[in-house]
Amino acid sequence: MADDRVAILTEDEEELKRKHLERFDRLSLEIQSPSQPPENDVPNDTAPTPSPQHELSCCERLFLRVNRHLLVSKVFYLFFYAAYGSLHPLLALYYKQLGMNPTQSGLLVGIRYFIEFCSAPFWGIVADRYRKGKAVLLFSMLCWILFNAGIGIVKPPIMACKEETIPTTTKVPTVHPTPSNETFFPNTSSTSQMRRRRDLIGQYPWRTILSSGQSSGYISEHRIKRDSNLSFTPAPEELANTTQTNQTSTTTQPKPSTSISTSTPSSTNTTSSSTTKSTTTNPNLPPPEYNMDQVNAIFLLILLVIIIGEFFSAPAITIVDTVTLHYLGPHRDRYGLQRMWGSLGWGLAMLCIGIWIDHTSTNLIIGNMECIMKNYKNYHIAFIVFGVLMVIALIVATQFKFDVQHHDTNEGQEVGNQQENVQPRGSPGTRSTDTPTIVQAEEFHFWDLMRLLCGVQYSTVLFVAWFMGFGYGFVFTFLYWHLQDLTGTTTLFGICSVLSHVSELAAYFTSHKFIELVGHIRVLYIGLACNTARYLYISYLENAWTVLPMEVLQGITHASVWAACISYLSAAVPPPLRTSAQGILQGLHLGLGRGCGAMVGGIFVNYFGVAETFRGIGMASLVILLIFSLIMYITGQNEKKEDKMLAENIPIPSSPVPIATIDLVQNTADVAAPARPEPKLPARKTQHQQEQEDLNKPAWVPSGSPWVSVALLVYQIREMVLLAKARPTVEVQPLQGTDEVRSDSQEDQSPPVFSDAVQNENTPSGLQDHSGSPTAQLDVPTRDTQPPSQHIS
């Protein structure tokens, strides 16, 4: 009985503590009542279940540990990225087989990133404003299926084989000066393919004889122009009679024979031999000739389909990322565990499709000449598999729960709590007894962020991020193009995809330790050096299969560099502007960088070739590495200390860095105070801003779609403009350089309040105030004067 009472008291204390922390807008450290567990809270994938473990089998315990909401996200990522990986890496090769040049192929691949960069924020705002997230998601998935299938049903252009022959010569019969009724016998003893110079002296009697013989097929005093592309050989009946080394007739003086190449068969009324035309084909089949008018028409048609389809299909992955982050709640650092299933599906689908296409390659017969185009790839298999997998992803997408009511309820509770904290102060005859007035410590604006990023140190980091995105887009578009020129197969492409995605996953989950070990800037050095080695190695390839060792560097050149850039900028800017900084970085790296890599790289490939372009980008990477290291050496004199400081600011998901926050709360008293105007309340922070200011959350997560932060950036700017128009100017009190807090009025006789806030020595130089953390908040003392009480959270 005593134990039950203790348990009840413990539950009541926990409930009171939770309400007390929510009132002051502090992050609740998962203090929940055991009797009333929340229904919509999703703690993690590995939360223990209350069922008895000894009565369940291993498989049952495994299924019980998996959250159902996050299981939907995992399955969606698996099938969506499996569909994407089965088709889109091969689209450049499909365009090449349709007869397009590298410029056209690069434009069709790269324009997707620019359209997605513009349309994803638009659809995100529409879905949030009208609360139609699920409808927009399903419509976007349907557009993925229809418009990508439309690319596959485009009728290919007409192809014609180019005829090539081995040059041969035709031996004209040796003519002797005989009467017109005598038979001409050809000299068929010579089988040499060499042509001999005509004897001008011996040519004159020939012309006389041919002109005097009216039965001859040659026109007198005229020579027929020789065709350089056609060749003639003696007739088969003439070849059958070549049993003697030299066949002659009863003539007086034989003249030397000549080699004349004609385009018409020779025939006479006498018994003469006629030559027939025979062609000799090259065993190496030439590439087919495309009808360029049809190729250009197909290019414009596919370009129109991509522009329309990508505009409507762009918000799909953005909305799913948002829902998944909502499922995770405060455990956003586990986003990588959900997104990794997409990388797994991409690699496996690409490998299977590559093997399947290799085993179903056909020899295309063109025209009546039966010109065979070897190793003609049937890419319709990829389109069919893409459609099937995307339909499955569409079915899975119907299971997402857009809990708008619960989200609105939480926002309403937050507003209600803030109104409860404010209402007693404005009511007549009432006095605030336990609620302090919180004044925002410091307010940062978007232009402050732009002024920071335009500095030499951070602008060079942004340029490196753009260049790495440029290289990633070029490799995604033209690596398989180059390997196919080296007789690489689609099976090789699948193996390359598996290796690159495995290396990216390993790099994502070890990036924190890697950055902490060497520092942010040195990670960028290593990424540029690996880019140089990789591109130069690819440019000198002679065997396509030797590219496999360099595909392991994809994790360093993409994943590690991406994580280092996000972490570096996140630690440099204050938390209220962290989302804006990440949106700018993602737009430069994944939007503008990848798009320029595909489009500009296609122009370079069209003019210089694939290998030469790889070599040029590799040398450019080396030059940028040298310039970047020189700039960092000049601007960052204490680089080692700064990198160590930034690495320490990255909280580890398993053991976040504890940060002590001391709140100075003024209690009530019966001492009367003179009346004074009430201070203006600060602007209400949105839920997203509160999540961004939470220092217990990691500075970066492996992002699956870059447009989530871009949409939030646009929405945040719009919200700032509306708030600035709606509310009057709020007087903001800056942080004090000393520990003394000034009173709000000269008439206030309350003693000064001293703060013992803990300052973080590892805060990087940026927009943050010199007195401490940018999220530090001061509680202004009220009119009631009593000793302040300290609350540590």
From Swiss-Prot:
InterPro entries: MFS_assoc_dom (IPR024989), MFS_MFSD6 (IPR051717), MFS_trans_sf (IPR036259). Coiled coil: none annotated. Pfam families: MFS_1_like (PF12832). Its main location: membrane. GO terms for biological process: antigen processing and presentation of exogenous peptide antigen via MHC class I. Keywords: Membrane, Transmembrane, Transmembrane helix. One of its GO terms (cellular component) is plasma membrane. CDD domains: MFS_MFSD6. It is found in: Membrane. The keyword Magnesium does not apply. Residues 180-193, 415-434, 757-776, 783-793 have a biased composition (Polar residues). It is a multi-pass membrane protein. The chain crosses the membrane at residues 75-95, 107-127, 134-154, 297-317, 340-360, 380-400, 461-481, 489-509, 555-575, 590-610, 616-636. Residues 28-53, 170-195, 239-288, 412-434, 674-699, 734-793 are annotated as: Disordered. SUPFAM superfamilies: MFS general substrate transporter. Residues 170-179, 241-283 have a biased composition (Low complexity). Belongs to the major facilitator superfamily. MFSD6 family. This is Major facilitator superfamily domain-containing protein 6-A. The lineage of its organism: Eukaryota, Metazoa, Chordata, Craniata, Vertebrata.
